[in-house]
Regions:
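Surface-exposed interaction regions that form or flank ligand-binding interfaces
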Residues: 1-77, 84-88, 100, 117-223
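A short, glycine/acidic-enriched catalytic loop
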Residues: 111
Length: 223
C-alpha cells in the first residue's frame, strides 16, 4: 500500500513538473494547446517534438505551426510548421507513416508498402508543400524570399528512392530534421535581417491556429 502511494505521488510530481515546464515553453505560447491535450494526441505531441528540436538550432529564428493559408476558391491549405531564419523560410510537411515509402517528385500519389504486401496510396507530400509555399508567397508578396521545402517522415518508415532533384527540397526522417536544417542553413546565403524575420513572422502569425477563426479550422479539408 505504501509503495503504491509513493508511485502515485511520483507520477503526480512528474506530471506537475513537466506541465510547469510546458507552460513556460514557446510551443505553448505559439500553439495555445494545453499540456494534457498535447501528451494525449499523437499529432500534437509529434509537432511538439518538432518544435523543441528546431528551438535548439543556434541563431535568430521564429517558428509557427498550423498556418491556415487562404486559397482562391475560399478554402484553405495548412502548412504544418514554418521555420524562419536568416537564410529564408523552411516549410515542413509532416507524415506519420510506417512501412516502405515509394514515390517521386512529379507523381500525384506516393505508395506506402506495409506488411503482407499491403499497399496504400497517399498524396504526394512534395506537391502538397509546393501548394503551401505558393500561398505563403502570396501572403508575403515578395518573390525574392528563399523558401525551402522539407518533407518529414516518421522514424518508423523506410524511405525508398525518394531523392529530390531540387536542392531546395528535402525528404527525410524525423531523426535527421535538425541535422538537415543546420546543413541547409550553413550552405545558404543570408538574405534576411532580424527585422525581416520578425516582419514575416507577424504576417504568417495572423493565419495560425491561435488566430484563425474556428470556422476556418473547421472548414479546412485535410488531405
Amino acid at each position: 500500500m505504501y509503495l503504491a502511494i509513493l508511485i502515485i505521488a511520483g507520477i503526480f510530481i512528474y506530471y506537475y513538473l513537466k506541465k510547469r515546464e510546458y507552460d513556460k515553453s514557446n510551443y505553448k505560447r505559439e500553439s495555445g494547446n494545453r499540456f494534457l491535450g498535447v501528451i494525449t494526441d499523437k499529432e500534437k505531441y509529434r509537432q511538439y517534438l518538432f518544435f523543441n528540436n528546431l528551438e535548439k538550432i543556434y541563431g535568430e529564428h521564429k517558428i509557427l505551426m498550423n498556418v491556415y493559408l487562404p486559397k482562391e476558391d475560399g478554402e484553405t491549405t495548412k502548412a504544418d510548421l514554418v521555420y524562419i531564419n536568416k537564410t529564408g523560410v523552411y516549410v515542413l510537411e509532416s507524415k506519420n507513416y510506417s512501412g516502405w515509402i515509394f514515390g517521386d517528385e512529379k507523381s500525384e500519389y506516393w505508395t506506402q508498402n506495409l506488411a503482407n504486401d499491403k499497399k496504400e496510396q497517399f498524396n504526394n507530400p512534395i506537391l502538397q508543400n509546393n501548394d503551401h509555399i505558393k500561398y505563403l508567397r502570396k501572403l508575403l508578396k515578395l518573390e525574392y524570399i528563399n523558401i525551402k521545402s522539407i518533407v518529414v517522415f516518421s522514424d518508423r518508415c523506410t524511405l525508398k528512392k525518394l531523392n529530390a532533384a531540387d536542392e531546395n527540397v528535402k525528404i527525410i526522417k524525423r531523426d535527421a530534421l535538425v541535422r538537415t536544417i543546420k546543413s541547409m542553413i550553413e550552405t545558404s546565403t543570408i538574405t534576411l535581417s532580424l527585422e525581416n524575420i520578425n516582419r514575416i513572422y507577424c504576417i504568417f502569425k495572423n493565419y495560425t491556429n491561435t488566430n484563425a477563426s474556428e470556422e476556418v479550422k473547421a472548414n479546412h479539408v485535410k488531405i
